[in-house]
From Swiss-Prot:
Subcellular location: Cytoplasm
GO cellular component: cytoplasm
Regulation: Feedback inhibited by histidine.
InterPro entries with a match to the protein in the record: ATP-PRT_HisG_long, ATP_PRibTrfase_cat, ATP_PRibTrfase_HisG, HisG_C, N-reg_PII-like_a/b, N-reg_PII/ATP_PRibTrfase_C
Major subcellular site: cytoplasm
Family classification: Belongs to the ATP phosphoribosyltransferase family. Long subfamily.
Keywords: Amino-acid biosynthesis, ATP-binding, Cytoplasm, Glycosyltransferase, Histidine biosynthesis, Magnesium, Metal-binding, Nucleotide-binding, Transferase
Keyword Cell division attributed: no
Organism: Methylacidiphilum infernorum (isolate V4)
GO annotation terms (biological process): L-histidine biosynthetic process
Cofactor: Mg(2+)
The protein's name in its UniProt record: ATP phosphoribosyltransferase
Function text: Catalyzes the condensation of ATP and 5-phosphoribose 1-diphosphate to form N'-(5'-phosphoribosyl)-ATP (PR-ATP). Has a crucial role in the pathway because the rate of histidine biosynthesis seems to be controlled primarily by regulation of HisG enzymatic activity.
Length: 292
């Protein structure tokens, strides 16, 4: 693709490390220095920019970036008109979505969202919260929070809407969740103009395939072994696989090689059982990508 160059915005901050690990698994090497906002990547058709995820969707819509990875939450918060290439189910420390939650101090009299009528709410996602309140018919004062939102309750505001992945920060600050207003995964996005270009669309579709295949391989491993033919049927009955295990005859005609893909968590119990059933040369190996 001679001459193709796409400016891609990757999230700076809490999602940065997980995103770099995902790109590495997908086959890309992104070289960063401590203060670099334009890291190098081993793909001549890409130029990487590290940008706050809150801003990526807006910059893609306006054409300053061609594509990027940012949360569904920030696309909605910015009301950005962008093309979603695919959803990427990963986050900072888990494979679960982050949640925007309405929370109050554990001793607050507020038990349900309607109890916040006329109260003050602090959040970084002002538009999301206003849309939520409008939907449930509650009028409250919503103010923008520049950070450390959890510590503002109850002295400065009555409630907050903040992002959480595990809930540990909320518990540490003695907060209680009243409602969840949104769940969000990162989205791989581009502008409508970029998606309309066939060459760029092919490039982005290939990237999406590689990124999703890297996510598919999470927590899965390959397992291969040699099995006596007479034990094959019994072993296949207990052996998980994506579809069916691969079975190949060995040169002596008495043994077969068996290979399969399975959840890593199952190997601990399965490997000793396979050994007892006559399998030999059992090898577990890691995976970078699974393309369905």
């Amino acid at each position: 693709m001679s001459g193709l160059k796409l400016r891609i915005g990757l999230p700076k901050g809490s999602l940065e490390e997980a995103t770099m690990e995902l790109f590495e698994k997908a086959g890309y090497i992104v070289a960063r220095s401590n203060r670099a906002y334009r890291p190098a990547i081993d793909d001549n058709e890409l130029e990487v920019r590290l940008v706050r995820p809150q801003e990526i969707a807006r910059y893609v819509e306006q054409g300053f970036l061609d594509c990027g990875i940012t949360g569904k939450d920030w696309i909605l918060e910015n009301n950005a008109d962008v093309h979603i290439i695919c959803e990427l189910k990963y986050n900072k420390s888990t494979s679960s979505p982050v949640k925007w939650v309405l929370a109050v101090h554990e001793n607050s009299p507020v038990r349900k969202p309607s109890d916040l009528q006329g109260k003050w709410i602090a959040t970084e996602a002002v538009n999301l919260v206003k849309q939520y309140l409008n939907k449930i018919g509650v009028e409250a004062h919503v103010e923008f929070s520049w950070g450390a939102t959890e510590v503002k309750v109850p002295e400065l505001v009555d409630a907050i809407v903040d992002i959480t992945e595990t809930g540990s920060s909320l518990r540490a600050n003695h907060l209680r969740i009243v409602d969840t207003i949104l769940e969000s995964f990162p989205q791989f996005i581009c502008s409508h103009k970029v998606w309309a270009d066939q060459e760029k669309r092919r490039k982005l579709s290939s990237m999406a395939l590689l990124l999703q295949s890297a996510l598919n391989a999470r927590n899965k491993v390959g397992l291969k072994m040699n099995v006596p033919k007479e034990n094959l049927s019994a072993i296949l009955k207990i052996l998980p696989s994506l579809r069916n295990p691969t079975v190949s005859p060995l040169a002596d005609g008495q043994w077969v090689a068996v290979e399969t893909i399975l959840d890593e968590s199952k190997v601990r119990d399965l490997a000793p059982q396979l050994k007892e059933m006559g399998a030999e040369g059992i090898i577990e190996y890691s995976l970078n990508k699974i393309i369905y």
